């Protein structure tokens, strides 16, 4: 395994916020993902790498996408503080925060601008949910020409099947799949 070029690599953490982490997930719990992701955030920031914390938020819901759906599964409950980053990552210095209004972290944000201005060509992705926020961001990153590494054990989904499908059939077409320990060894 080759070492990561820290000056050209960013860690992008998707939706590790209280209202999403608290949900039911598989194959890993929200707590397990936060534990792995927070190790990555600390290691990347200690090395001086660019770390992006992405969250989904809205003031009143009017700026969120509202397509007609056959399912209500996409409805997020928004109790007070639902969009706050989990404490394990919220106070780590030298991270860049992005707020999105949809699944992916590129559309309607300055993520691409921030990465390009720093000369970053590789993204390490983790977070919740494997098949929604992480997958959509990965597809957008692929279209923008970024190399990608997916940290399989630092992400999770609504079901074991969703996570397995995306990791087996989608991510290998967009980048490389590693685990947390492998990434930490590459720093």
From Swiss-Prot:
Record InterPro entries: Isochorismatase-like_dom, Isochorismatase-like_hydrls, Isochorismatase-like_sf
Documented EC number(s): 3.-.-.-
Keyword Hydrolase: yes
Matches recorded under Gene3D superfamilies: Isochorismatase-like
Xref: SUPFAM superfamilies: Isochorismatase-like hydrolases
Domain of life: Bacteria
GO MF assignments: hydrolase activity
Keyword vocabulary terms for this entry: Hydrolase, Plasmid
Record flagged with keyword Iron-sulfur: no
Family of this protein: Belongs to the isochorismatase family.
Alphabetical list of PANTHER family matching this protein: ISOCHORISMATASE FAMILY PROTEIN YECD, PEROXYUREIDOACRYLATE/UREIDOACRYLATE AMIDOHYDROLASE-RELATED
Protein name from the UniProt record: Uncharacterized isochorismatase family protein CA_P0030
Source organism per UniProt: Clostridium acetobutylicum (strain ATCC 824 / DSM 792 / JCM 1419 / IAM 19013 / LMG 5710 / NBRC 13948 / NRRL B-527 / VKM B-1787 / 2291 / W)
């Amino acid at each position: 395994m080759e070492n990561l070029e820290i000056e050209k690599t960013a860690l992008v953490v998707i939706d590790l916020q209280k209202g999403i982490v608290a949900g039911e997930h598989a194959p890993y719990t929200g707590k397990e993902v936060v534990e792995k992701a927070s190790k990555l955030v600390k290691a990347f920031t200690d090395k001086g790498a660019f770390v992006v914390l992405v969250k989904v938020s809205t003031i009143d819901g009017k700026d969120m996408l509202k397509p007609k759906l056959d399912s209500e599964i996409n409805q997020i409950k928004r109790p007070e503080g639902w969009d706050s980053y989990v404490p394990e990552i919220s106070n780590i210095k030298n991270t860049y925060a992005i707020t999105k209004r949809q699944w992916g972290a590129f559309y309607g944000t300055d993520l691409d601008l921030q990465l390009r201005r720093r000369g970053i060509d590789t993204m390490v992705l983790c977070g919740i949910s494997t098949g929604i926020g992480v997958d959509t961001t990965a597809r957008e990153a692929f279209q923008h020409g970024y190399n990608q590494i997916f940290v399989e054990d630092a992400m999770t989904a609504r079901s074991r099947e969703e996570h397995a499908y995306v990791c087996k059939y989608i991510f290998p077409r967009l980048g490389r799949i590693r685990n947390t320990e492998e990434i930490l060894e590459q720093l």
